[in-house]
Amino acid sequence: MRLAVVGHVEWIRFARVHSIPPAGGIEHAIEAWEGTGGGGGVAATQLAKLGDGCLFLTALGRDRVGEDSRAALEADGIEVHAAVRDEPTRTALTMIDDAGERTIVTLGDRLHPLAIDPLPWDRLAGADGVFFTAGDADALRSARTARTLVATSRVLDVLAAAAVRLDAIVGSELDPAERYTPIEPAPDLVVRTEGRRGGTWETADGRRGRYQAAAPPGPIVDTYGAGDSFQAGLTYGLARGDDVEDALALGARCGAAAAAGRGPTGGQLRAADL
């Protein structure tokens, strides 16, 4: 299948701690490492692992962090096409506590691709599946030339401005920044996630139901990236022709596997796991 992501990537500095320090407190890291993150980068990595690579249209700063981000993504089998900005690549600090829960502080503005950027937008035409995490309205319209288009509700203003039909939109009932409110035209599928409780879904033709969270393949290590991996799995399932329930089940498996691995991509499902 031909798969792609249009969106953002960030460079993350991770610290594993016993607990998140209270205001004014100090906590010593048990372990520290760095790597790519952000919804677009995590989803592109998951799609590349499930399929035969992934096209990623994004934006990076003209800096060492941008170079490191590109190299890390390409090492995971992703074909990266990035507009280069004078602004710095966004970074973030992420603490992971003993329960595997993550706390994030972002540093700098999110960089995302624009339709006027000299990127291979024509390669989205007829793609089996595209996941959209960030960009302008015209970038989303270019993504709509794909056979299947899924988007995150975190960029609801862009989705509303573009006014294109989405095959699916994923929102969160736990994160106010990702709460879905109706847009026109109505997406074919609206998914509202509830973390470890699974979530709900409804279609434009009136069908609705719940899906269950999948059991992780091991202890929960790190929830960073679980939601992005879920959305990538859903995109993959819809792109290969799964019905709603089966696509959501695959997404749930991807999210659970990611939570059982180190960092956002260490535990992600691969094609051999399907």
Sequence positions of predicted segments:
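A glycine-rich beta-to-alpha transition motif near the start of alpha/beta enzyme domains, typified by
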Residues: 18, 53-81
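Glycine-rich phosphate/adenosyl-contacting loop at the front of the ribokinase-like
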Residues: 1-57
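Ligand-binding loop in jelly-roll beta-barrel domains
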Residues: 89
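Conserved phosphate-binding/catalytic region of the ribokinase-like
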Residues: 181-274
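Short active-site-proximal "capping" loops at secondary-structure junctions
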Residues: 10-12, 61-65, 265
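Ribokinase/PfkB-type carbohydrate-kinase core domain
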Residues: 1-9, 70-84, 92-209
